[in-house]
């Protein structure tokens, strides 16, 4: 009896995990496939419109899968569920951790005035074939990476357009550097970034000295 129960458990377990997720002919929703590595067996799949869209709705629920396609079953390394706005060109690539590898950004939504865009960032590691999501990156408006100063530059469109600088902390969680500053006609952005980083470095050095006293 125990042997029968054990065999049933193994059968159910294999059925739960050994499934074909990618390239299903009758899968629910609209599927989008991204191949972040040279090895095309690794796939990032977005399952759009898993719930029927309500009239006039702009944001919808989607599943994102990252895994490896194999003949009999797919290995799913991780899965997440997010709300996002569906647009045609929703994938972009830009290096955000200064390792020379372009990372993957998935468009999530727009904010006020329609010009404020938000993204989910996944750091690409071609050696280990991993995609690592950066927590809270989708809170940074209109992000770009400044290679010279190694900072993330956010540009927000509000009543007064402004900049905010970020860097990655532990576990690649972004944190603010300095305070936001307005975009003016006389602004030299390069000099402004350099000045903020200089002040930040001086403050950090003083704090370390106080800690060791």
Where on the chain are the PLM-derived regions?
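N-terminal signal peptide c-region/cleavage motif recognized by signal peptidases
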Residues: 11-13
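Hydrophobic beta-strand segments that make up the repeating blades of beta-propeller
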Residues: 104-108
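Beta-propeller blade repeat segments, especially FG-GAP/WD-type strand-to-loop junctions
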Residues: 65-69, 115-133, 165-170
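Repeat-based blade/solenoid architectures
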Residues: 25-31, 79-90, 137-148
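Beta-propeller fold detector
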Residues: 75-78, 132-138, 175-183
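Acidic, small-residue rich beta-repeat scaffolds with periodic aromatic anchors
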Residues: 4-5, 16-56, 146-213
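Calcium-binding motifs, dominated by EF-hand helix-loop-helix domains
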Residues: 92-96
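Acidic carboxylate motifs that coordinate Ca2+ or other divalent cations, activating on Asp/Glu
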Residues: 99
């Amino acid at each position: 009896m125990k042997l029968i129960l054990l065999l049933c458990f193994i059968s159910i377990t294999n059925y739960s995990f050994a499934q074909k997720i990618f390239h299903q002919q009758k899968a629910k929703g609209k599927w989008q496939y991204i191949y972040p590595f040279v090895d095309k067996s690794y796939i990032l799949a977005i399952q759009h419109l898993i719930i029927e869209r309500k009239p006039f709705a702009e944001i919808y629920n989607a599943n994102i899968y990252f895994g490896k396609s194999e003949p009999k079953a797919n290995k799913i390394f991780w899965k997440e569920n997010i709300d996002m706005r569906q647009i045609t060109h929703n994938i972009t690539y830009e290096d955000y951790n200064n390792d020379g590898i372009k990372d993957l950004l998935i468009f999530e939504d727009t904010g006020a005035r329609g010009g404020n865009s938000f993204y989910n960032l996944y750091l690409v590691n071609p050696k280990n074939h991993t995609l690592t999501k950066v927590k809270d990156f989708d809170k940074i408006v209109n992000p770009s990476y400044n290679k010279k100063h190694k900072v993330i530059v956010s540009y927000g469109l509000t009543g007064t357009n402004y900049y905010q600088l970020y860097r990655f902390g532990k576990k690649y969680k972004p944190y603010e550097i300095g305070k936001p500053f307005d975009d003016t006609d006389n602004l030299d952005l390069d000099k402004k970034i350099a000045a903020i980083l200089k002040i930040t470095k001086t403050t950090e050095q003083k704090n370390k000295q106080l800690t060791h006293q």
